[in-house]
């Protein structure tokens, strides 16, 4: 469950044995766009994008919604993302958009969320829910940066496009939530393949590599 004070009744997935092969897992790879980085202050969510990964395949099951931030979008953010006030004027409010996203996650039967620098995206959602008195219970989640840190520990930067080029994976429209989710998904699948080539083939291996504890199994 994601919410405690106001329950919307969504279930992410079920408990999984630690020896579950990575190839048998499914993931929701997601990204957000916001009016800025100060989401704990006045910046707001303006887009959610996601794609479903089944095993080691990026599917065509995509989710996208703009979000009405109930404030102006700074010009520099419009220049960066291409999102204009007309795009969000009739878009759902944040909680409604997050609710739709969680319906998508549930439909996919996802075993966890994935993102590139995912901590920021989770913070964006958490702050939006807190504004409406919802409590956010973070989902089982994996960050491509943690996988990269294991596979290539000498690399220390966050740029998604840099890593996609380095690992030879597809690059989609940048600073678009769907585009970045697709870029992240293809990078994630390649990183999983590299893990498998090193003998890391199970959920337990993935948890160890990304420094997750057993709380992942308490869904």
Locate the predicted segments by residue.
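Short, amphipathic alpha-helical segments that act as regulatory/interfacial helices
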Residues: 126, 185-192
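Acidic, divalent-metal-coordinating active-site segment for phosphoryl/phosphodiester hydrolysis
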Residues: 176-188
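Short, acidic/small-residue loops that bind anionic groups at enzyme active sites
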Residues: 136-142
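Conserved non-catalytic scaffold segment of RNase H-like nuclease domains
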Residues: 2-131, 138, 157, 165, ...
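Acidic two-metal-ion nuclease catalytic site recognized across multiple nuclease folds
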Residues: 1-18, 189-219
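Short alpha-helix plus adjacent loop in nuclease-associated cores
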Residues: 130, 142-157
